[in-house]
């Protein structure tokens, strides 16, 4: 019995520990050990890396410390050297200053026994000149007191002959000074009389005073060496050169020189006063011209030019009257001597008048040329087209002299002579003023004549001709203004690490956001794309990188709760992690380098629990706090963004196996209907108020369960911003146009050589752009359904190329995001 019990126990023990169980147990334990070992190895590697990093940082800090110590020592040494240099320089400067002070003290000391200057002819002549100047009253200005005391002893030792000559010259200088006072008084009276006579009448000039005439005649008859005078154009002596005095003719020469010096003074004073008056008049006219030119008006500018011309004419007439009076004095004198000089002076006056008139005419013609050039070469000048036989119309209404026969010109011509006669009677020189005023009136009338001819030409046209008139800007070069825009590549943004799935432009601010498969959202500043001198195509970094999703981000959308551009201060994003997140928009003024490594609280809300699979598309309903989302779980959900609640869900009539790929709101339905495209190629129109299917625009294919072989899947659906028109891009390379009123297909065309991934409509509603996985972007005219431009963009990656495209709503930007993780900006 005992043996049997032992055998049963062994059998039971063998049944518990069988060979396979033991092997499984050992394998499991071995796997656990290997996993732990792998963890240990990874932790060891991390620790070794950390140790290496800390050691490298320690070495780096030591090198920095050593470098800083070297710099401190170098600066201390340099400071010591500078101090030594400054001390040595200060000592040298003190020594130099002491030497200079000693030299100045030695120079100031005058020796007691100073030798008098040697006698010579130069000293005697200098002494004579100094005594002349003392007696004439220039002692304080020219002769210094030190020189007077210096030569007192020398003046006592001069010879008797020189003293006699000095006494004679002293007597003559006293006499000349007395004569000068009388002559100045006489000349001042005579000049006052001459000025009054020249301003009132043009009578011949009175004869000069008898004293001056006799003195000049005697001086010229006696000797030519005593005085040499040069006559001015006005008949007065301008410069006198005094020769060394002699005993016989000293008195006559001194009197003539003094009279010649005293005569031009009152004439100079009068000419200076006239010159000041003329300059003040001209400055006033210039001020009025500058104040009037600030308005940039043609008529006011011409009026100011006339005033400037008249003021210059008056100033010139004043100068001409003075010059004519002086010329008449000269001619009266010259006529007594030579009759030929009179004819020469008249010819000179005529030539001067002709030059003045030609200058004024050129001035007025210059003004006309300026305004003609301004009107002819202005960039915004509009040309009239469709006038028909305008040349024949001109020929019929042209006169014999080539001018248009207008009724207003005769009245203007009759009124102008009265103004001319009235103005000419007030002026002294009648001929010149008439010509000036006629030239100014012709220049001012050029603009009015041009406007009158234009009005007459338009008045001669009929209503049918006026209907054909079109305004065109000639600077743009003809009929090319209606041509479509040509997009050119400008910039590429390379900051993402995986394919770019969504792009959104801010309507008002220069901001763009991009969502990528690298689990991030980047915010870009478009102002950084402006080219500079250093780099015409700068590589910019994003303002901020938003991280929060745990998977690829497929879509993004602005928060349009108020529907205004200024309120687009937050946006939504969704993707593979089935969560919709709301983010606040970073400001465009932040510095991307200062914010590097910082985590800022831009996340506002999260919408969790609404979907059971990835979210493909988001759509914000304008002017409402509602958001639509389409998911791979087969539902379209409506969310309240203020409370983060899911209001309801929409699904295909055939079940949840039909996955919505894209959604759009028809602009003509006041945001009450929803277009939804599915992976089987069907399109449904939902009513958002009743949550019911209104109509089915397109039937889906039968093989909807086999999604891998389904070529009819619609990847993008868009709605026209102004018309009841919807457009779709699908896997079968087609773009289809649907009429929302009749719910029928209007047009279908094969647009690309590969599946179409996205569509976008121009803000004007005239063009649509499409992108496909054949690496091409094509722009289409909606009315003619023709391709306008084809661009090759983005490199393919794993049978994918371009994921998304977007127009800027206000500015001339176009962006595309591809599988190569690059955003390309077109302009």
From Swiss-Prot:
* Localization per record: Cytoplasm; Membrane
> Chief subcellular site?
cytoplasm
Polar residues composition bias: residue spans: 337-346
Give residue spans, biased composition: Low complexity: 184-270, 311-334, 347-356, 416-432, 439-453
Instruction: Report each WD repeat as a residue range.
Output: 495-534, 548-593, 610-649, 709-748, 751-790, 797-827
List the GO biological process terms.
regulation of signal transduction
Identify one Pfam family in the record.
Striatin
Superkingdom to which the source organism belongs: Eukaryota
Which residue windows does the record flag with biased composition (Basic and acidic residues)?
Answer: 109-123
Positions of the UniProt region annotated as Disordered: 99-123, 181-270, 311-362, 400-459
Which PANTHER family does this chain map to? CONNECTOR OF KINASE TO AP-1, ISOFORM E (PTHR15653:SF0), STRIATIN (PTHR15653)
The protein's job, in short, is: Calmodulin-binding scaffolding protein which is the center of the striatin-interacting phosphatase and kinase (STRIPAK) complexes. STRIPAK complexes have critical roles in protein (de)phosphorylation and are regulators of multiple signaling pathways including Hippo, MAPK, nuclear receptor and cytoskeleton remodeling. Different types of STRIPAK complexes are involved in a variety of biological processes such as cell growth, differentiation, apoptosis, metabolism and immune regulation.
What subunit structure does UniProt give? Part of the core of STRIPAK complexes.
Query: How is this protein named in the record?
Result: Striatin homolog
């Amino acid at each position: 019995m005992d043996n049997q019990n032992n055998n049963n126990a062994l059998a039971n023990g063998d049944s518990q520990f069988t060979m396979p169980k033991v092997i499984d147990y050992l394998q499991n334990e071995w796997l656990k050990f290997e996993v732990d070992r792998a963890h240990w190895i990874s932790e060891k590697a991390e620790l070794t890396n950390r140790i290496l990093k800390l050691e490298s940082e320690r070495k780096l800090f030591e090198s920095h410390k050593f470098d800083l110590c070297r710099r401190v020592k170098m600066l201390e040494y340099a400071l010591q050297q500078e101090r030594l240099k400054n001390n040595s320089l200060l000592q040298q400067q003190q020594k130099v200053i002491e030497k200079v002070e000693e030299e100045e003290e030695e120079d100031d000391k005058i020796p007691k026994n100073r030798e008098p200057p040697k006698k010579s002819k130069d000293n005697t002549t200098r002494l004579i000149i100094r005594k002349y100047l003392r007696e004439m009253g220039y002692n304080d200005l020219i002769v210094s007191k030190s020189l007077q005391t210096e030569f007192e002893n020398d003046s006592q030792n001069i010879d008797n002959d020189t003293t006699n000559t000095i006494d004679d010259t002293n007597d003559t200088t006293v006499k000349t000074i007395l004569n000068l006072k009388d002559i100045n008084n006489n000349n001042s009276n005579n000049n006052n009389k001459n000025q009054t006579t020249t301003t009132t009448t043009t009578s011949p000039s009175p004869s000069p005073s008898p004293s001056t005439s006799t003195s000049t005649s005697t001086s010229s008859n006696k000797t030519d060496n005593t005085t040499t005078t040069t006559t001015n154009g006005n008949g007065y002596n301008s410069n006198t050169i005094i020769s060394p005095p002699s005993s016989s003719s000293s008195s006559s020469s001194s009197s003539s020189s003094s009279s010649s010096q005293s005569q031009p003074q009152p004439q100079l004073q009068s000419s200076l006063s006239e010159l000041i008056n003329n300059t003040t008049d001209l400055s006033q006219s210039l001020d009025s011209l500058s104040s009037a030119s600030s308005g940039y008006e043609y008529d006011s500018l011409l009026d100011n030019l006339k005033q400037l011309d008249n003021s210059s004419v008056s100033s010139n007439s004043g100068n001409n009257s003075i010059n004519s009076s002086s010329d008449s004095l000269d001619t009266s004198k010259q006529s007594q001597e030579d009759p030929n000089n009179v004819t020469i002076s008249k010819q000179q006056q005529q030539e001067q008048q002709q030059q003045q008139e030609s200058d004024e005419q050129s001035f007025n013609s210059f003004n006309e040329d300026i305004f003609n050039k301004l009107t002819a070469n202005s960039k915004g000048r509009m040309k009239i087209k469709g006038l028909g036989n305008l040349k024949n119309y001109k020929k019929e209404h042209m006169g014999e002299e080539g001018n248009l026969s207008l009724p207003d010109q005769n009245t203007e011509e009759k009124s102008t002579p009265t103004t001319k006669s009235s103005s000419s009677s007030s002026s002294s020189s009648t001929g010149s003023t008439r010509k000036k005023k006629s030239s100014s009136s012709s220049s001012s009338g050029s603009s009015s004549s041009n406007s009158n001819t234009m009005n007459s030409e338009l008045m001669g046209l009929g209503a049918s001709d006026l209907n054909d008139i079109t305004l065109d800007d000639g600077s743009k070069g003809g009929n090319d203004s209606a041509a479509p825009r040509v997009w050119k590549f400008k910039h590429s943004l390379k900051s993402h690490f995986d394919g770019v799935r969504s792009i959104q432009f801010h309507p008002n601010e220069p901001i763009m956001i991009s969502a990528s498969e690298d689990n991030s959202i980047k915010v870009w500043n478009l102002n950084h794309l402006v080219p500079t001198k250093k780099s015409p195509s700068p590589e910019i970094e994003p303002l901020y990188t938003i991280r929060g999703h745990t998977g690829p981000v497929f879509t993004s959308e602005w928060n349009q709760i108020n529907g205004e551009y200024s309120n687009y201060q937050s946006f939504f994003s969704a993707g593979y992690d089935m969560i919709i997140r709301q983010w606040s928009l970073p400001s465009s003024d932040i510095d991307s380098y200062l914010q590097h490594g910082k985590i800022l609280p831009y996340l506002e809300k999260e919408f969790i629990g609404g979907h059971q699979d990835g979210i493909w598309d988001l759509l914000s309903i304008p002017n409402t706090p509602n958001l639509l989302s389409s998911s791979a779980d087969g539902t379209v959900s409506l969310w309240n963004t203020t409370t983060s609640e899911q209001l309801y869900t929409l699904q295909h009539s055939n079940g949840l196996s039909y996955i919505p790929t894209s959604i759009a709101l028809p602009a003509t339905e006041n945001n009450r209907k929803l277009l939804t495209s599915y992976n089987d190629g069907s399109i449904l129109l939902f009513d958002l108020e009743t949550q019911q299917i209104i109509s089915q625009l397109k039937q889906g294919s039968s093989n909807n369960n086999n999604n891998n072989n389904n070529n009819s899947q619609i990847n993008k659906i868009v709605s026209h911003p102004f018309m009841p028109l919807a457009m779709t891009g699908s896997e079968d390379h087609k773009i289809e146009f649907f009429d929302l009123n009749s719910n029928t297909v209007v047009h279908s065309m094969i647009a690309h050589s590969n599946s179409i991934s996205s569509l976008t409509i121009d803000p004007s509603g005239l063009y649509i752009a499409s992108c496909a996985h054949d690496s091409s972007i094509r722009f289409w005219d909606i009315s003619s359904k023709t391709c306008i431009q084809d661009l090759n963009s983005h490199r393919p990656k794993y049978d994918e190329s371009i994921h998304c495209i977007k127009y800027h709503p206000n500015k001339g930007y176009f962006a595309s995001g591809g599988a190569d993780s690059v955003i390309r900006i077109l302009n």
